[in-house]
Design a protein with these regions (language model features):
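Active-site loop segments of alpha/beta catalytic cores
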Residues: 190-198, 212-221
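Shared catalytic-loop signature of beta/alpha-barrel
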Residues: 69-70, 205, 216-221
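N-terminal capping/lid subdomain adjacent to the active-site entrance of alpha/beta enzymes
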Residues: 1-181, 186-188, 195, 199-203
Length: 221
């Protein structure tokens, strides 16, 4: 099938600075893919490629050039994806898969579920971005007032003792049955102190501790 993939870059602006252990985001660049085919002139499939700077494994300095090259290859292959070759570019694979599936479905309603019909929501965690103690506490209180019962905190940017105190503050007011706590260090801990920090965190009855050390540190894990 003849097909065409247009790449549309956009810069999204965060409503407030989003802090992680790798820095603070104020903007995020994304690339939207528009998949079309002359055979079906009224159809369009839209996908999104959105790697996170310094976090995604395919955050490349020449990302846009790589994306353009892959899109041309997919066009030449009639819209077929080489899944094995694209595994090392997960954000590109996601964008292409989404666009192609949307195109052939002919609708945003990819699945017939209460959520896709707008009849019910999906419970998710309330994400707390990194900041100083008071700012993070204010975010937590706001999420809880909004009805969230699962709170996920980004940790690793401020003093560990302050982050621990923040978690202890929550636990002193809410048990694990009332509030489920999750933390994400984004690889901020070093292999030398990770075990001690994990031990201290485990005392707070956390649901999970995501990526304590950096990716690909296989021996240390």
């Amino acid at each position: 099938m003849d097909c065409k993939i247009d790449i549309i870059p956009q810069v999204l602006h965060f409503k407030q600075p989003a802090g992680t252990s790798r820095g603070t985001y104020t903007t995020r660049k994304v690339w939207y893919l528009h998949f079309t085919a002359p055979e079906f002139p009224n159809w369009v499939g839209i996908g999104e490629c959105a790697p996170l700077p310094n976090l995604s494994c395919d955050d490349l300095p020449d990302y846009e050039e790589v994306l353009a090259k892959i899109c041309r290859q997919v066009e030449n292959q009639g819209g077929k994806l080489d899944m094995e070759a694209l595994c090392k570019y997960p954000s590109i694979l996601f964008g292409l898969e989404t666009a192609i599936r949307h195109f052939f479905e002919g609708s945003w309603a990819l699945w017939d579920t209460p959520f896709s019909r707008g009849e019910a929501g999906i419970p998710i965690n309330g994400l707390i971005w990194m900041g100083d103690f008071n700012r993070m506490l204010a975010q937590i209180e706001k999420k809880m007032e909004a009805g969230f019962r699962c709170i996920k905190l980004k940790i690793g940017a401020i003093n560990f003792k302050e982050e621990l105190a923040l978690l202890q503050h929550i636990r002193s007011h809410y048990s694990s049955k009332e509030i489920e706590l999750r933390v994400d260090a984004n690889g901020a801990f070093s292999p030398t102190d990770a075990m001690e920090k994990l031990k201290r965190l485990s005392e707070l009855d956390l649901h999970s501790i995501e990526q304590p050390i950096r990716a690909a540190q296989w021996e240390e894990m």
